[in-house]
Amino acid sequence: MKKKALAFAAMACSVAMLLSACGGSNSNAASGDTAGSNIITAYNSEPQNPLIPGNTNETGGGKPVDLLFSRLVSFDKDGKASNEVAESITPNDDATQYTIKIKSGWKFTDGTPVTAESFTKAWSYVANAKNAQKCSSFFSAIAGYDDLQKDGLKGDEQLSGLKVVDDTTFTVDLNQSDSVFPIKVGYSAFAPLPESFYKDPKAFGEKPVSNGPYKLAPLGSQQGSRPRQEP
């Protein structure tokens, strides 16, 4: 999968997508620029917070987060959901437990694989009250959520309703039946996170390591950055 570059103009309060054309060349490109690349201004609002999926609930940050991070399911222009990172999302008879299998081969932009634990740790981090994430309540239906709202937490406690079976499989136990849970996991708060996130969440939010179709390419103060396309 090729990743296009997403560039953020920090001082100009704008977000630009660096879209690389497939094939051909740009005859007007300046010396040293990447051929076949263009800068298109897409979202003229600045993120209010660092770009962490579970702590983003506004348009300025939500748009780039949607481009940077792929979730278990995605939605087409008509709002129809289909599996993206997920291979399958299978409920038990009363939809109180789901077995989720993810596709192998997905990687973050730092080269590390997207695994089942990439989801379970990320979801638990967002749910944990110690971490004060804006989207915490989205995980209230998962067993163990109430335990992560108590005082005295360290921040690394995990949701008891999430169990890793193997690198590509995990289960989700819910507090009650929820037949639309497979749709909810398409929201950006349910994105996976790499291990590097937990070392310094604040620094991560300024330069996210993501798994979506775009990667972050910060613009310089004058000339900007060159569009990059990763294999």
What are these regions (language model features)?
Residues 19-21:
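C-terminal motif of bacterial Sec signal peptides marking the signal peptidase cleavage site
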Residues 87-138:
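Aromatic- and charge-enriched surface segment that lines or borders ligand/interaction sites
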Residues 118, 134-194, 220:
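Surface-exposed binding/hinge segments that line
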Residues 23-25:
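Bacterial signal peptide processing site
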Residues 35-49, 87, 97-100, 119-122, ...:
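Short, well-ordered beta-strand elements
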